UniProtKB/Swiss-Prot annotation:
The keyword Repeat does not apply. Pfam families: KdpA. Keywords: Cell membrane, Ion transport, Membrane, Potassium, Potassium transport, Transmembrane, Transmembrane helix, Transport. It is a multi-pass membrane protein. The gene is kdpA. It is found in: Cell membrane. Belongs to the KdpA family. This is Potassium-transporting ATPase potassium-binding subunit. The chain crosses the membrane at residues 11-31, 63-83, 134-154, 179-199, 254-274, 282-302, 329-349, 356-376, 379-399, 417-437, 488-508, 530-550. GO terms for cellular component: plasma membrane.
């Protein structure tokens, strides 16, 4: 137990050591003129000149939102065309065929929404050109889109006016100043530890038995870096980060975990710098971290305890539940990876979630249902800010004061927009899950009938709604029904909340901040952190508790 505690503590300390200065860097990159402008501004100026972008033109929230949707729609259309003709394009040494229309729709929506749900196997479903031009490109642009939304919200809370910035400038800066430099660093580290980086699509090797085997290769390291830094999650190979070419070593495992965790963990500190009150950032970070550690403890204990039926059958169960796990990672690092990838809504996996114990599988489900414990790049911060505003609103009602957040009144207009985003999340999980469980098109995909089958279906839609992308991969989901239904859920889960929170940002930026008084409810204290924790926990529990009882909890009770 001590070695597990020491491993986790070291990784947590590394996270804080990375996240705090990274938060300051993000603040300088987006909000402040500094020394980095001398290096990056000339590069950005070339991009602005070639694309005709007027980067200094401020936008209202409507203009900002329109620009975001247009850019995303254009990228989606280009990507759809690429996958439909990939067979005829170069860098296709494996002769990969064109994608079927509904699978193409699901795939391009998945990567555009930062979900990376994969109803295909990476090494056989995409050519190297598609992996580079489509997958890697989308991983940058979808992560940058999320960062722009967080940037716009932070800007709205830290200034007074009618505008929230320039989308194109924020989008370019997110790529040039943040994602590209970090990706280069992580790529070099991964290559150093043995992750392949080559244009060779296939390689024939001799096996230990004297036979030959063809191995799939490609530019894996460069994809892996942005896959995790951008909280994307889509794997170059079907086995994702369980594959030895994606994640060959415990060191690469730690690098990948910290990569997908660092930007979501840094954004609260960026927010603290922007509002000139670093305590604000620490309160948000601490609240999310406590929620995360609680969930991690549950999944680790569940997996270490193993399946009770194994012990009852006379077999040794002291090694815990190693089904679906890599021996090189073991239960501790597999459990931590599971918690991080669903907390940060990345979706990459170093073990098979379908093989988790019932309670172990409940944890990634719960983290995606909450969708605000760090969350994805940008959007996770927006989600926790949404809950922070709800907490302030409820606290204000209880003491009979007009709720205020950073001196700005939270009024019915903002709450209506927040509630739309809040209620949509469970709706697009529970409604399609019910439809799938009531129809043959849905139930025919279930590989484990019974309570686990319910969990498989609910997990698929929860992962889609939270823009996570992981799955209980026993589900046979490459059908028209699953491709279209999850595609629609991914679109709604991504863009409705983005539009709603940009509207909230547009409303708040125009309000005159109210001076702080002795009666002001402060949001930079431990008291507010406790209230925020309770708000997240209670709303999540009340919303999803019934379906969790029907799935993982009921399954657990059957094997006790």
């Amino acid at each position: 137990m001590w070695h597990v505690f020491s491993q986790y503590t070291l990784i947590f300390l590394l996270l804080i050591v990375i996240a705090v200065p990274l938060g300051k860097y993000l603040y300088v990159a987006f909000f402040e003129k500094g020394k980095i402008d001398r290096f990056f501004s000339p590069i950005e100026a070339v991009i602005y000149r070639l694309s005709g972008i007027r980067s200094l033109e401020e936008m209202t929230w409507k203009s900002y939102c329109t620009a975001l949707l247009i850019v995303n729609a254009a990228l989606l259309g280009i990507s759809y065309g690429l996958l439909r003709i990939q067979h005829y394009l170069p860098l296709n040494g494996a002769k990969v065929e064109n994608m079927e229309p509904t699978l193409t729709f699901n795939t391009v929506v998945s990567f555009m929404t930062n979900t990376n749900l994969q109803h295909y196997s990476g090494e056989s479903g995409l050519s190297i050109l598609s992996q580079m031009l489509f997958v890697t490109m989308m991983m940058f642009t979808s992560a940058a889109t999320g960062l722009t939304v967080a940037t716009a919200l932070i800007r709205a809370l830290s200034k007074k006016g009618k505008t929230i910035g320039n989308f194109y400038q924020d989008f370019v800066r997110a790529n040039v100043r943040v994602l590209l430099p970090l990706s280069v660093i992580v790529t070099i580290l991964l290559v150093a530890f043995g992750v392949p980086q080559t244009f060779l699509a296939r390689m024939a090797v001799s096996t230990l038995e004297g036979g030959t085997q063809t191995l799939a290769l490609g530019p894996v390291a460069s994809l892996e870096s942005i896959k995790h830094l951008g909280t994307n999650g889509g794997g170059f190979f079907g086995a994702n980060s369980s594959h030895p070419f994606e994640n060959p070593h415990p060191f690469t495992n730690v690098i990948e975990m910290l990569s997908m965790w660092c930007i979501p963990a840094a954004l609260p500190f960026t927010y603290g710098h922007a509002v000139k009150n670093r305590k604000q950032g620490w309160v948000l970070f601490a609240t999310m971290f406590v929620l995360f550690v609680m969930m991690l403890g549950v999944v680790y204990n569940a997996e270490q305890s193993g399946n009770p039926l194994v012990g009852k059958s006379g077999f040794a169960a002291d090694q815990g539940n190693m089904e679906g796990k890599e021996v090189r990672f073991g239960i501790p690092l597999s459990s931590l990876f599971t918690a991080i990838t669903t907390a940060a809504t990345t979706g990459s996996v170093n073990n098979m979630h379908d093989s988790l114990t019932p309670i172990g599988g409940l944890v990634p489900l719960a983290l995606m249902m909450l969708n605000n414990v760090f969350g994805g790049d940008g959007v996770g911060f927006v989600n926790i800010m949404m809950y922070a505003m709800i907490a302030v609103f409820l606290s204000g009602l209880m003491v009979g004061r007009t709720p205020e957040f950073l001196g700005r009144k939270i009024e019915p207009k903002e709450m209506k927009l927040i509630v739309i985003a809040l209620l949509l999340h469970p709706l697009i999980i529970l409604a399609p899950s019910a439809i799938a469980l009531m129809t043959h098109m849905g139930t025919e995909a279930i590989s484990n009938p019974g309570f686990h089958g319910i969990s498989q279906v609910v997990y698929e839609y929860t992962s889609s709604a939270a823009n996570n992308g992981s799955g209980f991969e026993g589900l046979k989901d490459n059908t028209a029904f699953w491709n279209i239904s999850t595609g629609v859920v991914m679109l709604l889960g991504r863009y409705v909340s983005i539009i709603a929170m940009l509207a909230v940002a547009g409303s708040l930026v125009g309000k005159q901040p109210v001076p702080e008084t002795i009666g002001t409810f402060r949001t930079d204290t431990a008291t507010f952190g406790v209230i925020l924790f309770g708000t997240v926990f209670i709303i999540g529990a009340l919303t999803f508790f019934p379906v969790l009882i029907l799935g993982p909890v009921a399954e657990y009770l059957t094997i006790r």
